[in-house]
Regions:
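Long, contiguous amphipathic alpha-helices that act as assembly "spine/axial" helices in icosahedral shell
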Residues: 1-21, 85, 170-172
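Sequence/fold signature of self-assembling virion shell proteins
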Residues: 33-69, 79-84, 90-188
Length: 188
């Protein structure tokens, strides 16, 4: 359970301002989800909506449009695409309606569900039960060198008997870390 909590902390702290409690700024000095990721040639990369919005058809479509407009360090468009929608347990029903409905949700029109029809989120959605913010949603992209998980020392367990008490002593040890290298790996 500890490993899942630490992995989810990357997204739970994704909006925390640098220097704030729980912040985990990237190499550019700003939080993972931010509108002010500096680019080497000037300007900024935004991997969040300009205005915070709840998960709905409009916010999801705008997020995908913004992902398609990601720029590299030279200011050129990349071919990065959204791959998977990540939601907390509180948004699982909304995510299911948005991703699986044949027709548009929350409308009387008989329009197709463009998100599903176009297959713009090919890996669908997943519910992460360790996310703390009930209305935050994330789109994992196919950006290379994004999220990181390093296992420095694999899990090792040791069990031995205590001669004096007859009790069995058991210990486990492992070293790992979670992080990110490229903020283009996620949009939130």
């Amino acid at each position: 359970n500890t490993k899942q909590v630490k992995a989810a902390a990357i997204l739970n702290d994704a909006f925390a301002a640098a220097g704030a409690a729980g912040s985990n700024p990237g190499g550019d000095g700003v939080s993972l989800i931010n509108t002010q990721h500096p680019l080497q040639t000037g300007g900024f990369l935004a991997n969040r909506l300009a205005t915070d919005a709840d998960l709905n058809e409009t916010s999801l479509e705008q997020s995908l449009i913004d992902i398609a407009d990601f720029r590299d360090e030279r200011g050129l468009r990349t071919a990065i695409q959204g791959m998977k929608l990540i939601v907390p347990r509180q948004l699982q029903f909304t995510a299911n309606r948005l991703m699986e409905s044949t027709l548009r949700t929350s409308t009387a029109d008989n329009d197709i569900n463009a998100i599903r029809n176009m297959g713009v989120i090919p890996q669908g959605y997943t519910v992460n039960h360790y996310l703390n913010d009930a209305d935050a949603f994330f789109i994992k992209t196919d950006a290379p060198n994004g999220f990181k998980h390093f296992t420095r020392t694999p899990l090792k367990t040791v069990m031995e008997g205590d001669f004096d008490t007859g009790n069995i002593r058991y210990k486990a040890r492992e070293r790992y870390s979670f992080g990110f290298s490229d903020p283009r790996c996620v949009f939130g």
